[in-house]
């Protein structure tokens, strides 16, 4: 996973105890160090194909995601916008999963922390 904080800090590692209804989880960084992460401090949690990604990839957000649910556009407080699909968005929850509409991109799915967003639009 790639963990992006609201303060723009980025950490990479793995977790085996992240649950959307919990306020924190443990992250094992790529160097083996363990730490507790508080979800409210995050922008989003990115479940990625690789830690490096593809710097040459041009985001398209035009792909249809089979079984992905409703189309959603998320604008984060830092100005970044991601378009994808979700089956679990509710304005009453602290966050939700989405699958980006860019199947060739590095992100397989994203857990968006609602308090880090500026606008959320359903299509």
Name each model-derived stretch.
Residues 1-123:
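Conserved RNA-binding domains used in RNP assembly and mRNA/RNA metabolism
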């Amino acid at each position: 996973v790639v963990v992006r904080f609201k303060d723009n800090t980025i950490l990479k590692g793995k977790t085996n105890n992240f649950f959307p209804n919990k306020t924190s989880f443990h992250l094992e960084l790529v160097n083996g160090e363990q730490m507790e992460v508080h979800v409210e401090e995050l922008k989003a949690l990115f479940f990625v194909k690789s830690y490096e990604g593809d710097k040459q990839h041009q985001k398209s957000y035009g792909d249809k995601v089979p079984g992905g649910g409703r189309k959603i556009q998320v604008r984060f407080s830092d100005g970044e916008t991601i378009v994808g699909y979700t089956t679990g968005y509710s304005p009453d929850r602290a966050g939700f999963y989405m699958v980006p509409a860019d199947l060739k991109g590095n992100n397989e799915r994203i857990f968006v922390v609602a308090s880090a967003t500026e606008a959320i639009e359903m299509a």
